[in-house]
Structure formats: C-alpha cells, structure tokens
Amino acid sequence: MKLHNNKENFIEVIQIVSRSLNISPSLIEKDYYVTMILKSINDEVSGLIFKGGTSLSKCHKAINRFSEDIDLTLDSEHLTEGQRKIVKPAIIKTCKNLGLTINNIEETRSRRDYNCYQISYPLLFKNDEVNPVIKVEVVFIQECYPDEIKKADSIIGEWLKANGFSKQAENYDLFSFDIHVQTIERTLIDKVFALCDYMISNNLQKHSRHIYDIYQLLKKVELNNEFNLLVNRVREDRKYNSLCVSAQDGADIPSLLKRVIETECYKKDYETNTIMMLYAPCSYEEAITGLKVIVESGMFQENDEYKKIRYIYLFQFLRKLKVIKNIEYLKCHQKAIITNILIKFKTVLLA
C-alpha cells in the first residue's frame, strides 16, 4: 500500500516530519511524489540514468535545497530506438499506478530526443511557492557519463528510518532504492556551461539555482587533472548542440563567469526564487564565491589537453569514414582532409 492512498495518515506523517525538520509540508508532499515517480520508472526501464539538480539532493546529498524536476536519460548501451520507445509507456504506467495525471501526454513523442512530461498530483498542502506539477524531462541529446549507483530516498522515508519507524517505511514502500546516477563531477561541469548559456541568451529566471549548486558541489569535487580532462571531453560533446553556445570554439568560460560575477545578472532571481527553495540559508554573496573558485582554478580554460582531445575525437570520426589511419597524418594534413570531406559531402548532397 502507498502512503498517499491513506489520506489521513499521509497528512499526519507530513505534518510530523515538517515540524521535526522545519521544512514546508508542501515541499515534503511534492518530494514524496517525485520519489515515488522516480522509483517506479526506474523499476520499469533498464539502463535509466538519473541526473540534474534533484539527483544532487536525493542521491548525492550534495545540496540543501528542494529540486522538483526529474531529469532522466539512458546509458549508451541502452540508447537504442527500441529502448527509447519503452520510456513513455513506463511513465504512463507509473502515473496510472500512482493515481497521477499527465497533463500534456498528447504533446510527447517517443521518437523525440527531448520530452517533458508534466505530471499533476492531488495537492493537500497549498503553497504559492510550490507548483503542484512535477516535470519529468527525458533527454537523449547528449551521452551521459560517467555514472555510478547511488541510493535514492524521500524526505519522509529517510525521516521514518532515522526515527525508528522502519516497519512503517517498509509497509508504505518507502525504503531507499538503488539507481544509476550521473556523477557530481559531470553535473558540476554541465551546470557551469548551462549557467553561461542562460546568461548569453538572457534567460535568467529560475536559473540562478546553478550558482548555489556549483558553490555546494565545490565542497565535494576535487579540481584536479582528471576533472580537467572530463571538462574537455564534455565541452567537445556539448559543441554538437547549437544551443550550447558556451561550448563552441572561441567561447571563453572564465570570461563569461567573470561577467556573471561583475554584472550580478542572476542576483535578483537568486534572492527571489532560489533562496525560497533552500532548506538552510545561503546568501547570494556567499554562493557567488563558487564562480570565483572556478575562474581561478583554470579548469575551464582551453589548453593543450583540450587540443589533444579535439584531435582524438576528429581522428575517431575520420577513421570511421575510412579517411585516415594515422593521427600524425591528421596533425599534418588536418585542413586538407576536412576540405576534402566537405567536397565529398557537397557532391553527395548535390547528387
């Protein structure tokens, strides 16, 4: 039996946990449904990877804020057309079993690289700051790596176990569960690029949360050579998405971050929206210091290692096309090779 099916018990438990943790009951209620949806989809879909802000709080325990969206993708092994078609039916089945409604089901398509399912739940605790809709975003545009297995839990489930109510947690299916989740290192990198992209497009509203997340993640992530290599690899992958402007050739991440700091373009949104979602206070002035650390670290500066990775990616691509066999040849004849490929593609397109 699910806890929300017993309305009186559900309300009582939420109120008790709310008083104990000093967290708004509406946030606890929404977190419960986020967790139940995530658990059910994870049970239905092989190769599922959980990523984004909610994974940071729910699995990594790296941030102390409420995150309401579920970001999902598939690992490279399961990223096939057949497996992608399984995701939508799994979400539909999940919502049916939990008694929830997908508001925009007719707008979603299994073949798309991106779908956002907007799921409504029966609201018991009203709060103007909390939207009673859970977004499940399924993205197949970029490969998700690296990942690891972590435990996921709801606020209610975690509280019940910590306070000697394990039996009740078991009865209501509120035990934690294993799920593949993107590492915090990769998520930190994605958030730095995303923060720059949103600034470039002047899409600032509700994106200042990335500043808070970056600040908190820096407490757990070691900025070393391995991290720098991952930055370069992610930059090269993001480059193939035209919306990822900050990953394109010539974009200077440190300069973009300095602009964010100097213009304070995210400050108003941070103090209006992000700060309302925090379980523990963290001022804008404190959070923005994380960007200064990133700038001074040099981790996002284009360097010789990044140039090597670009050569390797290009070499692998050209080798698949059976154009070259030796990377040294690539270094010496890169311009001529690319020109030759463009001529061949043009010939094919005009044929």
Describe every region a protein language model picked out.
Residues 110, 329-330, 339:
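Short, often N-terminal, low-complexity regions
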Residues 1-48, 58-64, 75-324:
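Structured mid-to-C-terminal alpha-helical surface segments
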